[in-house]
């Protein structure tokens, strides 16, 4: 899918066409050294737009300040997961929520567990009233596929719970707590943890994947899947505009 995206959109992570901006995020990663430098020296997120999360923030700021842009697609179609901290930070920037919340279910005992986080939404190193001043007046959508795993699966669930549009195909599932294992011959693989399962706001377990609001995969006569609609920005623009016009 990365090759198809590159073929249709070109190299890079941030693309625009008409009223729609599109950012490809292959993992929920916080690059520690750039963040340390940012907090030590200040500056602009534009100075760090080659990093993952800081690059996304830079792109959201560009879209917010562009009068032609009204829609913003977060592309998780090749996102294998990463840090729940980054995920909650992104949810906070989009929704305005100053507290992040992860919802779990214990596999062993069945009880529900909530884990809360405070979010420094303006990234000034303080949790205060100024965090409420960060706004992105954009129509957001998330794009997911069978490759969207772990946090790449949790994000569309939290996104939908908040009334935002999910596009693509059923996500790959997986919990945000995963185990790395090896076979006897050295093959390394990930599985979801046996101790906790992630749930949505209704308490439903989401580890089997999230079905999109709009399915974008086409199947040819030969049975082969066609993902070209994933990266058709004109089509995505029309779908987003129709969804938020309701």
Q: Which residues make up each language-model segment?
A:
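Flexible, low-complexity junctional segments that flank or bridge functional domains
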Residues: 1-80, 84-92, 96-102, 180-182, ...
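C-terminal soluble interaction/assembly domains
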Residues: 169-183
